[in-house]
């Protein structure tokens, strides 16, 4: 697996992804909209996220959201309390879930894991506050 920040194959070459690169990359649709007279409040960044157990997930989320917030863009992260995979359920932190979680999923029942504020969820949580 990859870690963030770090080098990742992208567009046929190896690219260093960090806060600056994320900001630069996410500026492209903003520049496109401005060049065409599309109001920025019409742009939505949807379904971004990272596997919560990978190194740098919290930083990645924070860097993406910081770049989006710089232009007051709408956003929707993936995935809030996903019911079939724990990988992007940031309220679970960075540890593995116990077997009871998977037993519930396999039985098509709600899992009983308690969600709570975690370091991984903080970049999102703080932006959801009034």
Predicted regions and their residues:
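Aromatic-rich peripheral "rim/lid" segments of glycoside hydrolase catalytic domains that contact
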Residues: 55-130
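Extracellular glycoside hydrolase catalytic/binding regions
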Residues: 1-71
């Amino acid at each position: 697996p990859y870690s963030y920040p770090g080098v990742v194959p992208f567009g046929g070459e190896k690219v260093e992804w960090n806060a600056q690169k994320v900001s630069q990359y996410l500026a492209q649709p903003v520049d496109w909209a401005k060049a065409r007279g599309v109001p920025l409040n019409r742009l939505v960044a949807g379904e971004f996220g990272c596997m919560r157990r990978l190194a740098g997930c919290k930083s990645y989320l924070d860097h993406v959201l910081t770049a989006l917030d710089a232009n007051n863009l709408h956003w929707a992260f993936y995935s809030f309390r996903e019911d079939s995979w724990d990988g992007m359920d940031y309220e679970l932190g960075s540890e593995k879930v116990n077997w009871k979680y998977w037993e519930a999923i396999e039985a098509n029942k709600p899992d009983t894991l308690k969600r709570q504020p975690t370091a991984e969820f903080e970049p999102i949580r703080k932006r959801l506050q009034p």
